[in-house]
């Protein structure tokens, strides 16, 4: 009886050991647990675990639970089994041309107008010779493996106390931006004065007139209750935030090739799914909620004038050549 008990315990212990994942990735992002992205990251993690039969486990941490983005990226460079949701502006700090993807009107310069065309354009960008070269440099020189950048968060517009229809309307306005040089140069090129303010401080900044407005998505503005401190939403659609999902190239190379493929495939799939949902459904829903709060939407914007003005940002940042090369490779122009 005792031998049987010992044998049973041994079988249970061995079974537990074999059931444990061989590879674990801790994935960090700064968004709240209620955001569509968090749900999409969880879906990606579940799909990977199922397809690898439990060999690969991705643990998702929302609200920057593992730390601030800058610290996590440095740990990733050092080879830690971590992942981070970031953007091309941040990756452009290592390989400058990659930052082109988060400059004003990038996706428009790629010829994309509909959500479907946005995803198609990004797929072509990923397959372009230039992007492959830049991604290889990120991976081999700086230790960042980009799993996917088919993750977009919707178009950003200007939310202010006055209507914005052309670049001249932004003259003298202090517009809140993230502290990224690429972002700030974009807003400066469009005619405004960029002011770096933390996301959580935007409401107070506009309320106290430390800033005259912000450039955000409808979802950002609604969730932050900014409809209480602005009057107009001017639909410039100047930036479509393209997110990069990155992990350590050292960790990624430790995986069997078939697992590498699964992780990338499922990351692309989850990203496209949530991006389409945001662009086709959620953005419009938040816009309608915004209107219900009494905010005036300005849709008759001179987009051509804004796109022309935006070119100065590419020139100032020294990446106009990168933009023109991608236009040639993606659009054949």
Which residue ranges define each predicted feature?
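Short, low-complexity disordered leader/linker segments with a strong preference
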Residues: 1-24, 333
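N-terminal secretory/targeting leader peptides
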Residues: 19-120, 137-333
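Signature of the catalytic double-stranded beta-helix
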Residues: 119-135
């Amino acid at each position: 009886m005792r031998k049987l008990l010992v044998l049973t315990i041994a079988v249970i212990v061995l079974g537990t050991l074999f059931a444990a994942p061989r590879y674990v990735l801790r994935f960090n992002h700064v968004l709240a647990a209620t955001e569509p992205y968090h749900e999409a990251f969880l879906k990606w993690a579940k799909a990977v675990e199922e397809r690898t039969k439990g060999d690969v486990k991705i643990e998702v941490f929302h609200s920057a639970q593992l730390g601030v983005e800058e610290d996590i990226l440095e740990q990733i460079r050092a080879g830690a089994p971590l992942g981070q949701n970031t953007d091309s502006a941040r990756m452009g700090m290592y390989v400058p041309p990659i930052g082109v993807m988060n400059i004003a009107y990038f996706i428009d310069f790629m010829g994309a107008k509909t959500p479907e065309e946005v995803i198609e354009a990004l797929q072509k960008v990923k397959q372009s010779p230039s992007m492959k070269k830049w991604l290889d440099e990120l991976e081999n020189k700086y230790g960042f493996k980009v799993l996917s950048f088919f993750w977009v968060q919707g178009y950003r517009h200007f939310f202010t106390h006055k209507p914005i229809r052309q670049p001249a309307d932004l003259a003298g306005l202090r517009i809140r931006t993230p502290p990224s040089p690429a972002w700030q140069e974009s807003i400066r090129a469009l005619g405004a004065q960029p002011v770096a303010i933390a996301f959580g401080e935007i409401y107070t900044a506009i309320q106290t007139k430390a800033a005259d407005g912000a450039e955000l998505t409808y979802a950002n503005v609604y969730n932050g209750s900014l409809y209480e401190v602005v009057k107009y939403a001017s639909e410039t659609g100047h930036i479509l935030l393209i997110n990069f999902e990155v992990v350590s190239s050292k960790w990624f190379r430790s995986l069997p090739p078939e697992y590498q493929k699964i992780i990338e495939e499922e990351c692309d799939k989850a990203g496209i799914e949530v991006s389409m949902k945001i662009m086709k459904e959620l953005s419009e829903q938040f816009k309608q909620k915004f209107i219900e709060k009494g905010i005036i939407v300005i849709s008759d914007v001179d987009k051509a004038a804004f796109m022309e003005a935006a070119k100065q940002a590419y020139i100032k940042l020294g990446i106009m050549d990168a933009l023109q090369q991608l236009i040639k490779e993606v659009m054949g122009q």
